[in-house]
Amino acid sequence: MPKRNDIKKIMIIGSGPIIIGQAAEFDYAGTQACLALKEEGYEVVLVNSNPATIMTDREIADTVYIEPITLEFVSKILRKERPDALLPTLGGQTGLNMAMELSKIGILEELNVELLGTKLSAIDQAEDRELFKELCERIGEPLCASDIATTVDEAVEIADKIGYPIIVRPAFTMGGTGGGICDTEEELREIVANGLKLSPVTQCLIEESIAGYKEIEYEVMRDSADNAIVVCNMENFDPVGVHTGDSIVFAPSQTLSDNEYQMLRDASLNIIRALKIEGGCNVQLALDPHSYEYRVIEVNPRVSRSSALASKATGYPIAKMSAKIAIGMTLDEIINPVTNKTYAMFEPALDYVVAKIARFPFDKFENGDRHLGTQMKATGEVMAIGRNIEESLLKAVRSLEIGVFHNDLQEAQDADDEILYEKMVKTQDDRLFYVSEAIRRGIPIEEIADLTKIDIFFLDKLLHIVEIEDQLKVNIFEPELLKTAKKNGFSDRQIAKLWNVSPEEVRRRRQENRTIPVYKMVDTCAAEFESSTPYFYSTYEWENESKRSSKEKIIVLGSGPIRIGQGVEFDYATVHCVKALQALGKEAIVINSNPETVSTDFSISDKLYFEPLTFEDVMNIIDLEQPEGVIVQFGGQTAINLAEPLSKAGVKILGTQVEDLDRAEDRDLFEKALQDLEIPQPPGATATNEEEAVANANKIGYPVLIRPSFVLGGRAMEIINNEKDLRDYMNRAVKASPEHPVLVDSYLQGRECEVDAICDGTEVLLPGIMEHIERAGVHSGDSMAVYPPQTFSQEIIDTIVDYTKRLAIGLNCIGMMNIQFVIFEEQVYVIEVNPRASRTVPFLSKVTNIPMAQLATQMILGKNLKDLGYTEGLAETPDMVHVKAPVFSFTKLAKVDSLLGPEMKSTGEAMGSDVTLEKALYKSFEAAKLHMADYGSVLFTVADEDKEETLALAKDFAEIGYSLVATQGTAAFFKENGLYVREVEKLAGGEDEEGTLVEDIRHGRVQAVVNTMGNTRASLTTATDGFRIRQEAISRGIPLFTSLDTVAAILKVMQSRSFTTKNI
């Protein structure tokens, strides 16, 4: 049926800040949906609290609210906007849960707002374990034996009935939060206790474990006329038991017989029809490899991470189609935008293999628990396309940017057999490398299949890779074998290693005998119909489908997989760069490897190459396209790291030149530049070994800030207070980059701020200065940032503007740069300069209304600020106050310490804007899910050096009616100063937690925790009390503060919202 004309205004709820389990795929889906609805003539109102996304740009919807996704604010917006309808299935679990809450309180009914797409009853049926079980029993679809537990004892009883191993799944949590596999009653008790706490309805599903079954996913679509199709089916390399977001995934499925494929396809369509889903839906199934037995694992009645992957894998835009189905259109009347001929009813067919590998944050969190289970831990993912499994897998491996270019890992090579077996059996993020190593050592693949439950078909492909390696070692420079290796995804670097020559030599030989890649089109129909999508992947075959146009071309390098330190903000800048290039009449070509993002939507750029961001893969595209130049400023450190090798190969780098990038990144050159420009920086020195570092630190004076050069996201950076800790650091952490020296700086504990600037070579524009709430020492990405600054004198602001201009001109910056300053004793020092777009670009672009990445792109292409109507200097400051707050994913990462420091730990950000600082802070805390109760108890456990400062905060808490709880030392200090405080027992390093503060936290007797213990290295073992207290607070969902500046900020909010009661 045609689209509905009885509704005019539609509201969409976004997914909020990026956390593990809910990442950039919802920016992509939401952006697509908003544009699809606008295209059909509807007025779109968007609510989302995440400033880092394209989705929250003004032009994506008619009205955009960057406000917290809470009942309080969404209700306000509903009353103000009065939409006819609400579309909740595009904002991940956040959007769904919000729609449920709005429906429950009756506001949708009161305002006569209709829910579009899948009905709430269907969402309930899919999400509520008990209802879903009833539905599956009714339609004859098999589920795992299971029961619901609302207490730990009930869970034990159920488990005894079903038999171990048991899987625990808390109801209504995202990304498997709080769940896990239990082999014993002890494990069960622990996991269920935590799961019940995290489940909003205090329920856990206790079910039989089918670990070892194959995990298969079907991405399906259905419309209101009951047309239903399979868009894509996918198979996990890892058997059931690893969260699909953490698994290696292949599309289409590889090991299913036709009967198995049809059986599971029928089951998926049966379920989506029974649920009456309207739009996209993801069905996960488990198949017994030894029979036709299968189980339905779960259904996601919404657009998901898998649907983003399926969209990019097939070219079929699921979110866009879902939005059109929601307004009443049917699959047989929506044209497929890829072919522009076939209808959306036509199931995509693939003539290639897609591999997805997850990207994990364990390079940042060395102490994190790397074991993979039913709780998701990956921050992002990469996807690669090839003509066979070997090619797509190896391309995906080198897309990960973890320093490997093949499925071999030094640690795996160094492991003895015992460790190797252990790593194969215990699923970790790096298991692929250990399995590959086992095959290299001649362990039969049958034995590996038995141990790991990985299908022997996949292991045979890994064996094939090893066989090619063995042939390469003995047949050096053999042209036919070189072709075979390239067809199977081998990189030049890997072949060079096996031949013992340089990668340049392999590239030269390849070009001599014309072993060069061709580019194939992703067209949804396996080349059955003409297709016009400019979406390509490389492979070593005959016919090249990517035709070079006569237009002036520019290549933009994307930022690869999302990880801590390099998030969706860089994708945002990439997309804006593309828009600016198109506006200037250039052909914009994007190279990227991330399936979750907007930049890899083929409708964004003029041409999209889905390829790894390595020198070889990028260079092959440059050879074909012959662009005017390459832009590296917007792809984070990934793109910046490619600037030098590309430039050496004769490629023109547009914008700031390589030697100037070096002057900002190389310590000695940077110091010289600052001296020439007469700009102060904290005293510091470089050291290449331990003794040099110690001598430097003694000269500068402790505390020192120490880090390797050339890093993003504060990798391996620490604040060090004495020589013992310094020696420990030099022995433990400097493996981060052996050929680069270590930087030792004086640590100035002042106020920090940062500036993004745009320069055309002669003039410099500063869109704004952002003041950090947390003092220097907390990574800028983990600090709350306030714009405009609230505490700086005019003199300080003038100095910052002056230094920024000097640096931009002095470093010959063309385009964007980011500078971080610290203000110590009213003197401004420069901490660091990044000659590229930074993670604050989206936030600052939105609050100043200056399209920074687009402007910078125009500068890179030779335009100047004056011509574009901008005056140099600091842009005018708006009346509102805006706060950017970091958002963390600690609940998903066991054994990772949440104490903030110079190493970045946040996965996303939220924003709050209002007329006063207090109101903006309140919104940003709410948006970041840091909700403080109006009254209750606050627990203080602080280091000795923080006690004085904590006293004032404690007094403020008491003043607004909070009770104070503290451990012995802190309590005594509070009492001496006239405060009433309840004393609790410390942990005293023992296991017995009875009567201690941990018990208080566990039983909800504490509403907030202020904890600064463990800042010094001496106590950084994970067993420290401070760490255990922080873990407990996080697992209980209790607001935790490890920086006193954040506490002061939230107190400001609470004071502004409470009335004081004073006697006269």
Swiss-Prot record:
Binds 4 Mg(2+) or Mn(2+) ions per subunit. It comes from the Bacteria. Mn(2+) 2 binds at E298, N300. Pathway: Amino-acid biosynthesis; L-arginine biosynthesis; carbamoyl phosphate from bicarbonate: step 1/1; Pyrimidine metabolism; UMP biosynthesis via de novo pathway; (S)-dihydroorotate from bicarbonate: step 1/3. Coiled coil: none annotated. Mg(2+) 1 binds at Q284, E298. Residues 1-401 are annotated as: Carboxyphosphate synthetic domain. Mg(2+) 4 binds at E832, N834. Mg(2+) 2 binds at E298, N300. Mn(2+) 1 binds at Q284, E298. Its EC number is 6.3.4.16, 6.3.5.5. NCBIfam families: CPSaseII_lrg (TIGR01369), PRK05294.1 (NF003671), PRK12815.1 (NF009455). This is Carbamoyl phosphate synthase large chain. It comes from Lactococcus lactis subsp. lactis (strain IL1403) (Streptococcus lactis).
